[in-house]
Amino acid sequence: VNAYLVALEGGKRFASVGGTSAASPVVAGIVAQINDRRLSAGKPTLGWLNPALYKCGEGVFHDVTTGKTSGGIVGGFPAAKGWDAATGFGTVQYKPLAKCLVAN
């Protein structure tokens, strides 16, 4: 699924993109915004993100339970309830994530 719409030629054309190459910069932007909010609150930036994500818990993600990846040696991985190799914990929900990461 191509989840992002990218403007080209100054907004004259649009293209849909997906995958890690699209998602990684989006998540980097989310973390940058949260770090800015933390600095404004007199707190340090997050640093190593994994411990903070696990502290927030699965409630800051939308669990993707259908679909599967394709390719690879095993022919892809199915999405499932909870953590899975296809979607991890799922998609980030910005507001709950920001609330948790700015508060802690």
Regions found by a protein language model. Name each.
Residues V1-N104:
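Extracellular protease catalytic domains of secreted zymogens
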